[in-house]
């Protein structure tokens, strides 16, 4: 019985083991990747969790980058994170003045909800991102203006 309870506690600790990074955004790589400089002058590449923005050479790629820049560039942000991706980037939710920048990119039609990694998100974030994309599609906002939007994961496959 004690082993079972300990196993459950370890499991829940691992899925809620999020840390927070605070710093100023000093770079925008694209519509879902930024660079944050913390108070100790350490730079971190941050990949916005739960979304996938168009690639730079893809339609809406530069527009998506500009949108993210308008949201966060030179602003102090909090990044709630719990992992790094295979490229060494910290993956997390970026908050600027209490606003979820990841969600805002999806609302603006500047990124897709990245369902492939949805299990890494809190349930409420999953629902928010899903509804934001549905609304952007319905209202034909941003990359949803035309019928020819290509998801970044499909674009990357054809670019290889």
Regions found by a protein language model. Give the residues of each.
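Small beta-barrel nucleic-acid-binding modules, principally OB-folds
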Residues: 10-12
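Small beta-barrel nucleic-acid-binding modules, primarily SNase/OB-fold domains
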Residues: 2-5, 14-160
């Amino acid at each position: 019985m004690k082993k079972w309870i300990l196993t459950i506690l370890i499991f829940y600790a691992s899925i809620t083991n999020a840390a927070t990074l605070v710093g100023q955004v000093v770079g925008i790589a694209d519509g879902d990747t930024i660079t944050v400089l913390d108070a100790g002058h350490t730079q971190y590449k941050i990949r916005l969790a739960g979304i996938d923005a168009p690639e730079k050479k893809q339609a809406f790629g530069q527009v998506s980058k500009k949108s993210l820049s308008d949201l966060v560039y030179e602003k102090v942000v909090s990044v709630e994170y719990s992992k790094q991706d295979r490229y060494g980037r910290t993956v997390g939710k970026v908050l600027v003045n209490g606003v979820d920048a990841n969600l805002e990119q999806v609302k603006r039609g500047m990124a897709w909800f990245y369902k492939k990694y949805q299990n890494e998100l809190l349930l409420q974030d999953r629902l928010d991102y899903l509804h934001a994309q549905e609304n952007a599609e319905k209202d034909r906002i941003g990359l949803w203006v035309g019928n020819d939007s290509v998801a970044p994961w499909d674009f990357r496959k054809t670019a290889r």
